[in-house]
From Swiss-Prot:
Alphabetical UniProt keywords: Cell membrane, Cell wall biogenesis/degradation, Glycosyltransferase, Membrane, Transferase, Transmembrane, Transmembrane helix
InterPro entries assigned to the protein according to its UniProt record, in alphabetical order: ArabinofuranosylTrfase_AftA_C (IPR020959), ArabinofuranosylTrfase_AftA_N (IPR020963)
Pathway where it operates: Cell wall biogenesis; cell wall polysaccharide biosynthesis
Keyword Coiled coil: no
Regions that span the bilayer: 25-45, 66-86, 97-117, 180-200, 205-225, 229-249, 255-272, 276-293, 309-329, 355-375, 384-404, 420-440, 445-465
Keyword Cell wall biogenesis/degradation: yes
Extracellular compartment segments: 466-643
Name used for this protein in its record: Galactan 5-O-arabinofuranosyltransferase
GO cellular component: peptidoglycan-based cell wall; plasma membrane
Regulation of activity: Not inhibited by the anti-tuberculosis drug ethambutol (EMB).
Coiled coil location: none
Single GO biological process annotation from the record: cell wall macromolecule biosynthetic process
Amino acid sequence: MPSRRKSPQFGHEMGAFTSARAREVLVALGQLAAAVVVAVGVAVVSLLAIARVEWPAFPSSNQLHALTTVGQVGCLAGLVGIGWLWRHGRFRRLARLGGLVLVSAFTVVTLGMPLGATKLYLFGISVDQQFRTEYLTRLTDTAALRDMTYIGLPPFYPPGWFWIGGRAAALTGTPAWEMFKPWAITSMAIAVAVALVLWWRMIRFEYALLVTVATAAVMLAYSSPEPYAAMITVLLPPMLVLTWSGLGARDRQGWAAVVGAGVFLGFAATWYTLLVAYGAFTVVLMALLLAGSRLQSGIKAAVDPLCRLAVVGAIAAAIGSTTWLPYLLRAARDPVSDTGSAQHYLPADGAALTFPMLQFSLLGAICLLGTLWLVMRARSSAPAGALAIGVLAVYLWSLLSMLATLARTTLLSFRLQPTLSVLLVAAGAFGFVEAVQALGKRGRGVIPMAAAIGLAGAIAFSQDIPDVLRPDLTIAYTDTDGYGQRGDRRPPGSEKYYPAIDAAIRRVTGKRRDRTVVLTADYSFLSYYPYWGFQGLTPHYANPLAQFDKRATQIDSWSGLSTADEFIAALDKLPWQPPTVFLMRHGAHNSYTLRLAQDVYPNQPNVRRYTVDLRTALFADPRFVVEDIGPFVLAIRKPQESA
């Protein structure tokens, strides 16, 4: 339950956030805004500086890793110095500014330096990063909320991160695929800086530095390939502490924290569905635990946390509706397909509980320390209570996800593993501080020794992050970018023909890209250019309103057609806007091929790839323009025929 006795490291409990005093709230908001500005400034300057140098590729040279380590050590040493300045009461405003600069710089150097010789982000333009880049491309082409692939549909996937990145790309005139890397790194730097402000509003500044850099390092190691999820992940620990204290406050106290919790959940609802669902689940658990513990004090006392929960929910729903309402209204009147739902995924990690505190590693050690601290302090410390409930919620969510397989779905619990690690590492940082304080009473030399051990551990973990991310970094260098180049300077792949394909489509159709529907199995083409797709990458990322399974059936049926007349008649009868551009590959026996996907959950892998062969005779007609471009076959239905 909320703290009755403060633990040593939990100084001015909850600061402005649990107080409704307007001045303190305004100060807190000002500091949050300053954190965003500082993070953006640091990221932009740093990334521009890195981009000015022609670096060797990360997979074939250790230079970028070496420079990453130097930058990380400099940032961590600087944070130690800033903590020392603060502890001795010197230059405190400058110390806060320096803290924001250095945690932002730590984030940028950890990812920006290893990616310095490529324009692509982690995992390049492959698999999941294809659809993410496609979404960013769509929302660069238009500020309207639209589906990433299907014409005329509202978005199902939360657009928040992609919309802001798209607006930045449009404002600067940068291709969306090229904006992905700087926006990903900048957005995570923003999240880390905001997390620092949230922590220093609740605990002593030097401890806030420690908790922030520890959680940031784990986030960068295990969540950074999905940058919008990483942002929510690093903000979850301070927001859970804030929410726990707000729900547990009495009388007129804590309402600023309640509002803050609602705003955070609403923001998360526009950012990442799974984490807002987990966050809401955790907040409900908090409210129920508080209500149950207060039953002996009367109904009014027990109902108060539930009323606060209702306020949190109302605020979150109001904010979340800005992006979810168009989809919900459309889904209320149009058929929705659950075939290929995003929840149809059960890897081995989702079939077992994970216990990072039992790993024989540096991460395992800090997680074990955090676990012990949670057990000891959960009832006496608000941070411990909040983080403990967050950890328990992950395990409960995982068990519910396993049970959900009986209903032929899952809750994607394996994606909460980075969240679990971040929560335990935050607890471990608190436990480390408390252990040092307890041992420090026995001698003055304990604190310098602990500082040295902590700094060494932070450097050891941080310098290993590029190795943790090495597979994703390698793909960022081996994939071909939108300019037809690879980061490792080796011969590019077939994507180098995309500019010629784009030029041919625009020449024949005479239309803007956002007026053309393309059927292709080379989905990275849609990641680089904002054409609409007739069919998505996989059923799991397809908008349920798009009826992926029915579209797949229609495409498969075309393999049985023999003439162009039959094919054009079939296209014109489609219940959706038909494709006018077909980007295919050559097949055997006078055919063109498309390699498509089918949902086969609960099997693993959960997607089966299959090939659809279309006879060349379907396109051997004056109503089509057919052209070979590299390994591709581009067939375009002439505008007067598709009108």
